[in-house]
Amino acid sequence: MYKYLLFDIDGTILDFKAAENLAIKALFKKYKLIECTDEMVNDYAKINDKYWQALERGEMTKPEILVGRFVEFFKSINVDTSIASDFNKDYQLELGEYVVFEDYAIELLTMLKGKLNEDGSRKYRLLAVTNGTKIAQEKKIKTSGLDKIFDGVYISEDIGVEKPNVAFFDTLFMEEGITDKSEVVIIGDSLTSDILGGINAGIDTIWYNPHHKENTNGLAITKTIFSLRELDNRRCFE
């Protein structure tokens, strides 16, 4: 039976794409840039994904990707790249202003937090695990009220390494006093950070795949779900 439920934040509990769209459009207005369309945000998102994957592979540092993604994006739309650093700083703060939950996320977490053992003790310890920046994640977790639901929040910037690096999970295991990995499962939408990270760490994995993507990496996933409602099952975490 699982006792420790590790939840990714962006794309699993929170609808990151929706918040990303709102934050970027708001900043384009603040900086008095050209009109930002959905198509432009989608193009940025592809660039952003590419940079984060480079970070996960250890090919770039976090400061490099945070600014570099906007430099490349601005070049593609003929916007002055000299604002990239300041734009990124404002973007981290702006992201925390927009909280959009994935379908059934808050209901699921609330239900799991209320699950009790026969002796009245809590059945699960809910832990957030994220590669997002510290400033953005702390703000959105507080704004969303998730700080009152999660028992612990683990941010890669605090730990010093990103998922899927096994050191991220080793730090969590040590701080939580976890010795039996069979009691731990990670739930996340990213194959390259959440699922690969869980596999690297030797724990079970649940791939949240609402867009029905293919497992192109051929990873040995413990369970795949297409809706968080599938986790609302009394046997799901047993």
Regions found by a protein language model. Give the residues of each.
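Conserved H-loop
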Residues: 34, 80, 115, 147-151, ...
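N-terminal helical cap/lid subdomain that shapes the substrate entry/recognition surface
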Residues: 2-102
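Catalytic-core regions built around general acid/base machinery
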Residues: 104-123
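Internal, well-ordered alpha-helical segments in soluble enzyme and binding-protein domains
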Residues: 66-69, 108, 168
